[in-house]
C-alpha cells in the first residue's frame, strides 16, 4: 500500500477552492487503497492532527495575512469585517512590496516553516509520493527546497498558474510573467510530474515548456463527484434559483433584471449565499420582488451542496477575461440540474463545459434584455430533467477525481 502526502492550504472544515480539489483527490486515493495524509493550514479550534474520513490530517499555523483573511471571510460581519479586511489588504500589499523581487512569495518565514513541517512528516512516515498544490505558494516552495537526500517522488498540482495571470496590484503582467517563469523553472526542475489544468493547456503549449514536456500531464477540476446526503431534500413550493459564491458586480444587476418580474409575481424565489455585500442590489428591484430575494451570508460547504440539490435552478456567473475555470462550474454540472449561466466575455472559460451540458441556458449580457428574458422564461417553463450522474461522468471524465488520482498513483511505480 503506497503512502501519499497531499500539501495544500485550507482543508475540510474551512476549505478553499483548492482545498476542495485536494479533498476529492485524497478521498479517491483512499478508495484506491492508499495511505493518505494531508498537510494544511490550521484554523482557530482546529486540532493539530486528526483522522478525517480515513485520512491523517496534519495542520500548520498560518501567517498573519492568511489568519486575517480567513477571519474576515469566515467569522466576521459588518464594520468589524470591513476593518479586518482593510488591515489584511494593507499587510498583503506591504508584503508584496517588501518581497517584490521574489514574487509570488510573500512570507519567507512561513515558507521555511511549511518546508520544515513537510520534511518532519516525510522523515516520520516515509511517503512514496508528495503532491503539493499551487496555491498555496508555501506548499510548492516546500516541495522544491526539501532535503534532496530524501527519497520521494514529487508531484506539483498547479491548480493556479505562476504565469498565466491577470494584472494584480501595482505589478504589470510582464513583470508577473517574468518572475513566475523564474519560479516555474526552479520548481519544475525538482518535480517528477507536473499536473496542469486543462484551462491553461494553451498557455503551457508554449515552446519554452518543451524542456519539461515529458513531466507534464493535463488534468481538470476534479469535482465530477456524486454526493449522498441524509438530509431531507424536500423542495420548496415555489420555484427556486440558487447562487453561492462571490458576486460579479457587472453581472448581478442583469440577473436581477431577468428574474425581477417572476420574483414579483411569486413565480420564483432567488436564494443567495455570499460574503459579498448585497444591500445595494436590493435597491435595484421593487418591493414586491424583494420579498422573494433571500440573501444569506457565509455558510459551510455541506449546506451549499444540500441547497444546490434542493433548488430547481442553479445560477452560474462567468469569468471576466480569464482562462481560469472556476471549480463551481463542475460542481453545478455534477448535480445534473438546470443551470442558468450569465456571462459577459465571449471567450468565457465556462462555455466549453456548458455547451455540451444538455441542461443549461447561457445568456450573454451584451444581448438584448428582452431576448434574454424570453430565453429564461422558455427555459423555466420547459420540462425539467436531471441528467444522470453516470452520463455526466462519461461526458466529463477528465473532471472525475479517479482520473487525477490514477495519474498520481501511477507515479508510485516509477521508482
Named regions from a protein language model:
Residues 224-227, 234-284:
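Conserved catalytic-core segment of nucleotide-activated headgroup transferases in glycan assembly
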Residues 24, 138, 145, 162, ...:
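Membrane-proximal helix-turn-helix segments that form the acceptor-binding/catalytic region
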Residues 280-303:
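Nucleotide-activated donor-binding/catalytic signature segment of Leloir-type glycosyltransferases, i.e.
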Residues 309-394:
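Catalytic binding pocket for nucleotide-activated donors in carbohydrate/polymer assembly enzymes
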Residues 4, 129, 145-165:
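Active-site proximal beta-strand in glycosyltransferases
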Residues 162, 200, 218-228:
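Short beta-strand->alpha-helix junction loop in the catalytic core
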Residues 186-216:
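A short, active-site helix/loop in glycosyltransferases that binds the activated sugar's phosphate group
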Residues 78-129, 176, 180:
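Conserved nucleotide-sugar donor-binding subdomain of glycosyltransferases
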Amino acid at each position: 500500500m503506497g503512502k501519499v502526502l497531499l500539501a495544500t492550504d485550507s482543508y475540510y472544515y474551512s476549505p478553499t477552492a483548492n482545498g476542495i480539489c485536494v479533498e476529492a483527490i485524497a478521498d479517491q486515493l483512499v478508495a484506491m487503497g492508499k495511505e493518505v495524509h494531508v498537510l494544511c493550514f490550521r484554523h482557530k479550534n482546529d486540532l493539530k492532527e486528526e483522522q478525517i474520513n480515513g485520512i491523517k490530517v496534519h495542520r500548520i499555523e498560518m501567517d498573519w495575512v492568511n489568519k486575517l483573511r480567513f477571519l474576515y471571510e469566515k467569522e466576521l460581519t459588518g464594520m468589524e469585517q470591513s476593518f479586518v479586511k482593510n488591515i489584511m489588504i494593507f499587510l498583503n500589499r506591504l508584503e508584496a512590496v517588501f518581497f517584490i523581487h521574489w514574487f509570488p512569495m510573500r512570507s519567507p518565514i512561513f515558507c521555511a516553516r511549511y518546508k520544515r513541517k513537510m520534511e518532519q512528516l516525510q522523515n516520520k512516515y516515509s511517503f512514496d509520493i508528495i503532491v503539493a498544490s499551487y496555491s498555496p505558494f508555501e506548499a510548492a516552495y516546500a516541495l522544491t527546497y526539501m532535503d534532496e537526500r530524501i527519497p520521494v517522488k514529487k508531484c506539483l498540482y498547479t491548480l493556479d498558474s505562476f504565469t498565466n495571470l491577470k494584472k494584480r496590484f501595482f505589478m504589470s503582467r510582464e513583470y508577473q510573467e517574468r518572475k513566475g517563469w523564474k519560479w516555474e523553472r526552479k520548481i519544475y526542475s525538482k518535480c517528477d510530474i507536473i499536473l496542469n489544468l486543462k484551462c491553461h493547456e494553451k498557455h503551457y503549449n508554449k515552446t519554452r515548456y518543451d524542456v519539461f514536456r515529458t513531466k507534464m500531464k493535463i488534468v481538470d477540476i476534479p469535482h465530477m463527484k456524486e454526493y449522498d446526503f441524509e438530509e431531507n431534500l424536500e423542495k420548496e413550493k415555489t420555484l427556486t434559483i440558487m447562487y453561492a459564491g462571490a458576486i460579479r458586480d457587472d453581472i448581478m444587476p442583469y440577473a436581477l433584471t431577468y428574474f425581477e418580474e417572476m420574483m414579483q409575481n411569486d413565480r420564483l424565489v432567488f436564494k443567495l449565499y455570499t460574503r459579498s455585500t448585497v444591500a445595494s442590489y436590493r435597491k435595484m428591484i421593487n418591493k414586491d420582488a424583494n420579498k422573494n430575494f433571500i440573501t444569506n451570508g457565509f455558510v459551510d460547504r455541506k449546506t451549499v451542496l444540500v441547497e444546490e440539490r434542493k433548488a430547481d435552478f442553479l445560477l452560474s456567473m462567468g469569468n471576466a477575461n480569464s482562462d481560469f475555470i472556476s471549480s463551481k462550474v463542475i460542481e453545478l454540472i455534477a448535480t445534473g440540474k438546470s443551470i442558468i449561466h450569465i456571462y459577459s466575455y465571449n471567450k468565457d472559460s465556462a462555455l466549453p463545459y456548458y455547451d455540451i451540458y444538455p441542461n443549461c441556458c447561457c445568456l450573454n449580457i451584451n444581448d438584448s434584455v428582452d431576448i434574454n428574458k424570453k430565453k429564461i422564461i422558455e427555459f423555466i417553463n420547459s420540462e425539467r430533467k436531471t441528467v444522470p450522474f453516470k452520463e455526466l461522468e462519461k461526458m466529463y471524465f477528465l473532471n472525475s477525481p479517479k482520473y487525477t488520482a490514477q495519474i498520481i498513483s501511477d507515479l508510485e511505480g516509477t521508482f
